[in-house]
Amino acid sequence: MIPFSETLILQCIYGSQVSRDFLAKTEGLQNLIQDTQESAKLGTLRGLKNYQLHLRSPHSAFNLLLQSAGAIYMKQYLLEIDNDLRKLFTHGKEFGYVANIHDAVNIECDPEVVEPICKILTNGFEKASVALGLRYYVKGKPSVGHSQWETH
């Protein structure tokens, strides 16, 4: 059992207020959630790349839409960076994939190719956004370190 701490108590007290403030102050978010729930009454939603998403219940529609968009985006991102990495480097020699966890890809590489690999990883965000036809591009940047602990 987790012991009570001042931090835990404050998170419980103010966490819901932060969520309410975010919802209230993010223009269009409430409308998007309501429109998504309204569309969900038909039992399915259309996700990125026109994928059909099957719902268990209308109240979970927005979460399903977000989760599927994240998964589709990450798959496209991985395709983009893999194509570019393999144009310049040999998998298993200069670089290798270690893990792909939710919204992060872990790569190990030779020290002399860190910079060009970081450039490929950074450019991959725009390439994936373009490939998926997003109006607002996802942005990100790689973290470099000797371990998972150093990069997170």
Regions found by a protein language model. Give the residues of each.
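Conserved catalytic core of nucleotide polymerization and phosphodiester-bond processing enzymes
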Residues: 1-152
